[in-house]
């Protein structure tokens, strides 16, 4: 079988974090002329266990695509997966890595809400936090793959990539910056990648929290000119927020304090690694 990438390799991977804006960034970059994406957003190749290095199978996800400068894979599971970094490095050590980070407490809440909506969680947020933090305290290594809390231990996860890739290939971004200053933030990334800048005519809100029926409506509406759909877009977003509020249990302040305390050491390490002021996260 002929290799779908014609001797080329995937050279740009957004590894996470989950619930931190990866879908928004993906949506923006799919419109950029220098990027090629797989037929599905999350290929999951390097997070599949048991793992077999079958690169032709991986490349088949790009079959029929026009191959541009950056051949990209956006799979948020890769940041938390304990073996993904080493698998990516073995595949292509020249890969550029994008890591989007969000306040870990807010990320955990969003992750929990997603699991509730999908029917994968029935416990209260307090019960999930209690269970996850106890399990992680007793782990000799940070195994975060299935953990709502563990996925927010960013410094420990980034360290795996730092050990295998040079710093100029690791591109760190903040979720808040992507939300509040979208064009500036995306263009800063594009500058680091040596790619041309973009102009956004509207702010992108790729919202995987939409209920399935709302997703289908949004997909149609998002293709129509903003001038005709601004009010409808607002209605859909408000409906999505109400739906989320109705389907997820409340989060109590005491649990948030427990979570902040649990993340503190990792956040201080992340602050040192990034040079960011993370006082609003700690």
Protein language model regions, located:
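PAPS-dependent sulfotransferase catalytic core
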Residues: 1-82, 90-95, 104-138, 165
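Aromatic-acidic/polar surface patches that form glycan- and anion
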Residues: 7, 15-18, 51, 77-81, ...
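Generic structural signal for small/hydrophobic residues in well-ordered secondary structure
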Residues: 21-22, 58, 72, 88, ...
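Generic secondary-structure boundary/loop-capping signal
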Residues: 32, 42-43, 75-76, 151, ...
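Generic structural signal for secondary-structure transition and capping sites
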Residues: 34, 67, 113, 198, ...
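PAPS-dependent sulfotransferase catalytic domain
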Residues: 52-64, 120-202
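Alpha-helical packing segments of well-folded alpha/beta enzyme cores
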Residues: 58-61, 84, 154-158, 185, ...
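The conserved 3'-phosphoadenosine-5'-phosphosulfate
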Residues: 159-257, 261, 276, 281-282
């Amino acid at each position: 079988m002929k290799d779908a990438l014609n001797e080329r390799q995937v050279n740009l991977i957004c590894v996470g974090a989950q619930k931190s804006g990866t879908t928004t960034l993906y949506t923006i970059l799919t419109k950029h002329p220098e990027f090629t994406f797989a037929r599905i957003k999350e290929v999951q190749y390097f997070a599949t266990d048991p793992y077999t290095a079958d690169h032709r199978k991986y490349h088949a996800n790009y079959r029929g695509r026009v191959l541009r400068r950056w051949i990209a894979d956006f799979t948020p599971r890769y940041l938390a997966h304990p073996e993904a970094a080493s698998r990516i490095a073995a595949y292509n050590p020249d890969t550029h890595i994008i890591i989007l980070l969000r306040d870990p407490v807010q990320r955990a809440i969003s992750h929990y809400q997603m699991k509730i909506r999908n029917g994968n969680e029935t416990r209260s947020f307090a019960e999930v936090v209690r269970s996850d933090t106890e399990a992680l305290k007793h782990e000799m290594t940070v195994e975060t793959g299935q953990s709502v809390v563990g996925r927010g231990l960013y410094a420990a996860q980034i360290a795996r990539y730092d050990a295998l890739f040079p710093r100029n290939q690791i591109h760190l971004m903040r979720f808040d910056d992507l939300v509040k200053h979208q064009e500036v933030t995306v263009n800063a990334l594009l500058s680091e990648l040596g790619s041309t800048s973009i102009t956004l005519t509207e702010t992108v809100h790729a919202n995987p929290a939409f209920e399935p029926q709302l997703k289908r409506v949004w997909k149609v509406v998002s293709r129509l000119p903003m001038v005709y759909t601004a009010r409808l877009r607002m209605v859909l977003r408000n409906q999505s927020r109400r739906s989320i509020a109705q389907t997820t249990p409340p989060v109590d302040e005491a649990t948030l304090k427990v979570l902040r305390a649990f993340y503190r050491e990792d956040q201080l390490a992340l602050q040192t690694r990034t040079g960011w002021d993370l006082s609003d996260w700690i």
